């Protein structure tokens, strides 16, 4: 949301008074994020990892995170482009395709896993950078959905983008909560969306960017 109207190439909007009077909405996003990690699990996951998860009675995504966290920041030069279903923002190109770049004999499955995490986070940052170039100052980000369940991924987003990230108690049902906020204002429980949101949205976790990692 912004109090000013301006245009960002590849990002939808601004939509004046879309949510609150006197504010405008910008809409940019990725066509694939958590689904790329699911793709990795379904297609590239080593059988030994699956067996290890069974032996340790561990969620497979937690094990993937553990393996990825053992790889250095920057993934030893391996880069993953997140255009697995095209690019929504800032290029708006449905024909763009994802890739791994920088593979070597030393590349391991853990490198590929970390590259997925980093690539998705950098994809989000690409949208933010485009907005900043147009004059929009992003000060904090609230995340919801499946990706927001991962502390590792949320901290990585904060480190790469360079602003605090927050998740909410209702992050897995954010759409339903939004409906409740609208209804609460509609029936007069709250006088406006600002007060309703302040009262009904509860922050769960905060991720402060590590500026050393950001470099």
Language-model region placement:
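Glycine/Thr-rich phosphate-binding loops that ligate phosphate moieties of nucleotide
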Residues: 2-215
């Amino acid at each position: 949301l912004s109090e000013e109207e301006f245009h960002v190439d590849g990002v939808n909007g601004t939509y004046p008074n879309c949510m609150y009077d006197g504010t405008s909405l910008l809409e940019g996003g990725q066509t694939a994020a958590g689904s790329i990690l699911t793709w990795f699990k379904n297609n590239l996951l080593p059988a030994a990892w699956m067996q290890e998860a069974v032996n340790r009675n561990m969620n497979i995504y937690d094990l993937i995170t553990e393996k990825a966290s053992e790889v250095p920041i920057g993934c030893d030069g391996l880069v993953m482009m997140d255009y697995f279903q095209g690019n929504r923002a800032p290029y708006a190109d449905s024909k763009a395709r994802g890739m791994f770049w920088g593979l070597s004999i030393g590349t391991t499955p853990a490198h590929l896993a970390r590259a997925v995490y980093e690539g998705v986070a950098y994809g989000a940052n690409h949208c933010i950078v485009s907005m900043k170039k147009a004059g929009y100052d992003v000060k904090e980000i609230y995340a919801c959905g499946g990706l927001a369940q991962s502390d590792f991924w949320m901290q990585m987003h904060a480190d790469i983008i360079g602003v605090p990230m927050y998740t909410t108690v209702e992050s897995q049902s954010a759409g339903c909560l939004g409906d409740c906020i609208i209804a609460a204002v509609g029936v007069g429980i709250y006088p406006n969306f600002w007060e309703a949101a302040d009262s009904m949205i509860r922050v769960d976790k905060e991720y402060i960017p590590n500026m050393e990692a950001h470099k």
